[in-house]
Amino acid sequence: MADSTADESTNADTLWRELHKVLPEIWYDGGGKDHCEIDEAIRILTCLRKIESKNPESDISPVEVPKEFICTLSNKIMIEPMLIASGQTFEKSYILEWLKHERTCPRTKQVLYHRFMIPNHLINEVIKEWCLIHNFDRPKTSDEVIDLFTGDLESLLQRISSPSSVEDQTEAAKELALKAKRFSSVCVYFVAKIPDSITRLLTPLSISEDSNPEFLENIVTALHIFSTSEKNKTLVAENPLVLPLLAKYMKQGTVLTRIHSAATVNSLSYTDSNKIIIGNSEVLKALIHVIEEGDSLATSEAFSALSNLCPVKEISEKAVSEGLIRAAIKKIKAGSNVSMLLSLLAFVSTQNHQTTEEMDNLGLIYDLFSILRNSNSLVNDENAVVIVYNICKSYKALQNVVLREEKRDVVLEEENKHGTFTRLENQEAGRATSLAKRILEWILR
């Protein structure tokens, strides 16, 4: 009896060695090129099942899952093996998530000529046989969200917050920004699942002298991308490091740093609960600085942020007191970002009529006349005439009769020389036509 058991043990060892020779051939040929190898694997597994059934005590020892049964994406035994164009097999839910973002095979790195996949029934049968022999409880399919690209986020953050060298820190920041840009799951996971992730990400910026522009660009870029996820907006805005650093880097740093800093504020400003937080911070003044001094892209982001914030009257009043009107008019006079800034000034002048005095003192009305004479945009026409109308309302309210008549004459002269408001009245272009008519009624009375 002892000899028989020993023989069976020897046979089992031999069979396992044979199986481990066959499995790689099946896997790396895609599991479907040679059915003889599949049949051989099933034959070996059937023999093993017979041997194991005579030695139930062997089931007690722990079982190591063959690496060929493990999906390289999930690092778990496959439940629904799927064959892709490269001939490689992966767990269904993981390869589906991978192919949402990638056009390459995770194992071979070759570019896939299509993203179709089919169930690998042959490999599935081999795994089922193995599980039966070892009484291995194969997991059921799950609706669990796949965090496929998040495995190295903690190590990247560690390299950023506790760097071994400046070069490695910069490279880690670059990798993090690229990951965040490519995979939406990374954005949510980084902020929600990694403890103190935003603080750890930004701490190097709060203690450094900004001597590494590339590192700074990548960190601010990553922060911008994290802020675009709806789930992250409040958590990011409420972090005490975020807004002071964004305010700082809207005023200094590279062009890209300024653009991404303004874009981050813009992204955060879409959430109502963030508006008061932003309005009460130094970010508001920094946005106005970007409007006045920034390039076109940064100005566009700052404009969008202010458009989100200024409907809150307290924030609008603060923005005006911080120099919004002067900054916007400076850009309009320079011919930069005219359309968006006209839109902003039209809103502000309607919301707060006291702003029209500053607009008038800065000579904006002459720029508006020029825009109305030369514009091919109905939107610009409407916004420009809204501002002119609001300025005229402030003229009409003047107590000094002489000054009031002088101001009226300025508008009348424009009409007499160029017929600006008559042309607008005849356009039948909605609000612009209506306001032009009112202006004409006042100046031609």
Swiss-Prot record:
It holds the Pfam family U-box. Residues 64-137 form the U-box domain. Its EC number is 2.3.2.27. The keyword Transferase applies. One of its GO terms (molecular function) is ubiquitin-protein transferase activity. The keyword Transferase applies. Gene3D superfamilies: Leucine-rich Repeat Variant, Zinc/RING finger domain, C3HC4 (zinc finger). Keywords: Transferase, Ubl conjugation pathway. Pathway: Protein modification; protein ubiquitination. CDD domains: RING-Ubox_PUB. It is an enzyme of class 2 (transferase). GO terms for biological process: protein ubiquitination. Transmembrane segments: none annotated. It catalyses: S-ubiquitinyl-[E2 ubiquitin-conjugating enzyme]-L-cysteine + [acceptor protein]-L-lysine = [E2 ubiquitin-conjugating enzyme]-L-cysteine + N(6)-ubiquitinyl-[acceptor protein]-L-lysine. InterPro entries: ARM-like (IPR011989), ARM-type_fold (IPR016024), RING-Ubox_PUB (IPR045210), Ubox_domain (IPR003613), Znf_RING/FYVE/PHD (IPR013083). It comes from the Eukaryota. Functions as an E3 ubiquitin ligase. This is Putative U-box domain-containing protein 47.
